[in-house]
């Protein structure tokens, strides 16, 4: 009796775990047979004579053997069905993972301090079957990290080209990390709009590794960012990186903002309807049309907004345009704010506000009376006029150096009359300069003559030393001829100055007499 009850419990447990309908029908029939057998055994146990007990015992043994054989057959059928289900599941997983080859993802990497997820590229599916942490069959994927931070994560360049001579265990670089398919997460693309001061980032250095640092300043126009690298092993801790060489890291504040934005977006999506969305679109279009129409009747200043950014590296007008500002309209959501920037004003030093108001009233209430911009423009006009006068005055002024360059060093006249006119003009020009200026010019020309004579002596020595080289002799002769012409010009200047000085000395003697 106890054996029948134990067999009945086993059948009931198998019936709870059975998933196939045919198997459940067989188990139900076996359960009914056992229940009937138990009922008959209880009913006939008291009425049967003692001499029939051995025959009854034999029948019970036969029934027990039959029951065991049926249970073993059911277990074999269940195990074969489970194996078929597992093979079908693995085939589906391999098909799914094979289609993912070449896609980007976020894969885990085991560091000495824990597990961290990094962006990676799926490059293949491994043949080995594993059981994940949840006890479910899974396949492994081979991934290459796109932002490696350690040497063991750095992809082998020879392996990518199919020319690596080492296997995965002996190569110092990565041939691809093996991760389970269930641990793969969604790819996190870099969001450069998050770049701001003190933002943690990964920066790419020449060693092909991504090092951690913090942002110092960002230039969104040229897409350049200055980063201070963490650690003391970098010679230049502050460097400029392009946006393509940076990967902004996610902070706790970003996660909170994303969660709040997702919650608000989902609540708004549930509360709004298609009709409300269309109404909002119509209102937005009407608002923009009204803003454009308003800009046509708005006061147009002489300088456009943001014109000063032409001389600076400011990006204020570009940021305003990205935030929805329409050029020509005023500030504010309705476009009725100011159009021109608030100008700076400087009040007179040491004067009270009442005195400043009196000065403004005396100027007929001019609001720009103390404007810095007006003062700067006035100063620019005065400086421009002064520069023009100075230019005219300097252009008309003729000093002794200009005279010598124009008259003495200039091209000579071809006729006798022109030479006489030039000499007369030269004499008149020299007479206009003081004796001190003539003395200074005489000393300068004497120094030039001595320097030119030394150069001629060096060229002459070179001619004597290189008498066998025809090409060099030709070049040296050209130099010698040029030096002679310059020396003749300087000597002519010296004679003119000496003549003028001698004339002045003679006049002084005559006046003293």
UniProtKB/Swiss-Prot annotation:
Keywords: DNA-binding, Metal-binding, Nucleus, Repressor, Transcription, Transcription regulation, Zinc, Zinc-finger. Transcription repressor. Its main location: nucleus. Residues 496-513 have a biased composition (Basic and acidic residues). Pfam families: G-patch (PF01585). Residues 312-358 form the G-patch domain. Residues 252-261, 273-283 have a biased composition (Acidic residues). It comes from the Eukaryota. Residues 252-283, 477-513 are annotated as: Disordered. GO terms for cellular component: nucleus. It comes from Drosophila simulans. This is Zinc finger CCCH-type with G patch domain-containing protein. It is found in: Nucleus. A zinc finger (C3H1-type) spans 155-178. Residues 477-495 have a biased composition (Polar residues). InterPro entries: G_patch_dom (IPR000467), Znf_CCCH (IPR000571). GO terms for molecular function: DNA-binding transcription repressor activity, RNA polymerase II-specific; RNA polymerase II cis-regulatory region sequence-specific DNA binding; zinc ion binding.
